[in-house]
């Protein structure tokens, strides 16, 4: 039990208490369901691969998005991780291609550009099909560092590719009086004409 609790505790969002609760729930689960869950975890590692084009996890290579002939080849949405790609895709409003960096620059944590999927992105841009690269990162220091690095790389090596980023500011349904100062600053900087 302790071994399982420790392993579950390594997952994001699992502290010692939630890992213990999950382990106990697995113990109470009928044997067939627990074995099915274990099989699903094994299948996750065995059956998924990284798409050779966009670096997303998929059951096939190329992934369904890269294989879709109806997607726009001229626009790539650059995301830090698979979670971000899934969120963008669930919205149903982006019809271009994606590229997953596999993280963000985090010098304090020892994550530099060599650990990100920048070389495959560079290879895609070198083909000359892409006209715009949309940076879909959050508003963290790591996101800012990554955005700056990518923007500089593209400006230096692929000046014909426009670089844009998702707008930042006050979320829909929020009130100004409840916003932190940085969100208000970003909202003012990125204000739009009506």
Please report, for each region that a protein language model flagged, where it lies by residue:
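Short cysteine-rich clusters marking metal-coordination/redox-active sites
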Residues: 51-54, 63-66
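Short functional micro-motifs and their immediate structural scaffolds
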Residues: 58-60, 71
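Extended interfacial segments that mediate partner engagement and assembly in macromolecular machines
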Residues: 19, 68-137
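Short metal-coordination and nucleic-acid-contact micro-motifs, chiefly zinc-binding Cys/His arrays
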Residues: 44-47, 59
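Long C-terminal interaction/binding lobes of large macromolecular proteins
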Residues: 3, 94-95, 122-194
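Extended, structured, electrostatic nucleic-acid-contact surfaces
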Residues: 1-12
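Short, ordered loop/turn segments at secondary-structure junctions
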Residues: 24, 82-83, 103-105, 138-140, ...
């Amino acid at each position: 039990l302790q071994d399982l609790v420790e392993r579950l505790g390594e997952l994001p969002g699992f502290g010692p208490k939630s890992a213990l609760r999950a382990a106990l729930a697995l113990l109470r689960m009928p044997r067939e369901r627990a074995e099915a869950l274990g099989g699903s975890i094994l299948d996750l590692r065995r059956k998924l691969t990284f798409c050779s084009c966009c670096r997303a996890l998929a059951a096939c290579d190329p992934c369904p998005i890269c294989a879709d002939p109806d997607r726009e080849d001229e626009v790539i949405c650059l995301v830090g991780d698979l979670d971000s790609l899934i969120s963008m895709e669930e919205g149903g409003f982006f019809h271009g291609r994606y590229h997953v960096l596999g993280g963000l620059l985090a010098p304090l944590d020892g994550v530099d550009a060599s650990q990100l999927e920048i070389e495959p992105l560079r290879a895609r841009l070198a083909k000359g099909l892409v006209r715009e690269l949309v940076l879909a990162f959050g508003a963290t220091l790591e996101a800012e560092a990554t955005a700056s690095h990518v923007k500089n790389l593209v400006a230096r090596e692929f000046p014909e590719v426009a670089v844009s980023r998702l707008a930042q500011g006050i979320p829909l349904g929020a009130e100004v009086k409840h916003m932190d100062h940085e969100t208000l600053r970003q909202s003012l900087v990125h204000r739009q004409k009506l």
